[in-house]
Amino acid sequence: MRPLARTATGLASAGGFTTLACLTHADPALRGLFRAGGSHYGVSDPESLARDTHKFESRYLDWLIAPLTPGNRQAYLDRSPVRNAGRLSAPVTFFQGAEDKIVPPGQTEQMVTALREKGITTQYLLFAGEQHGFRQAANIRWALDAEFYFFDTLVFRGQRPA
């Protein structure tokens, strides 16, 4: 695969996990596919989420990865963006609800800390009064504007397609 110099990905929830998983993937060709990423309340540590999540989502990672058993733990480690943050070299923007019970803010904060320690360009916006998904119109607009700013100004530096 040839890296697409102008390709970025930004997704929410399990999509945020997918974004982070692609950027930290063991295969360098897949890691290099995206120039930057965005994670809206995405999972960064599936193992800790599987151990400590609310009842409604308690079996979700069984379907997404596998049931968390001693025999499957390595699958969780292999797919954990925060545990594989050392592989990531692309800028990432993060958006998180402060009252999120599905993907707690600590998930995002661990990833942000790991990337900042590596010197990776990051943007982190924590929205007070928001949960898993944003409901307040002002916060939705703020997130959209911040994501556009991040990709346009910090990543692509205002370059426009020919």
Q: What are the language-model segments listed below?
A:
Residues 1-162:
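Active-site-proximal cap/loop segments of hydrolase catalytic domains
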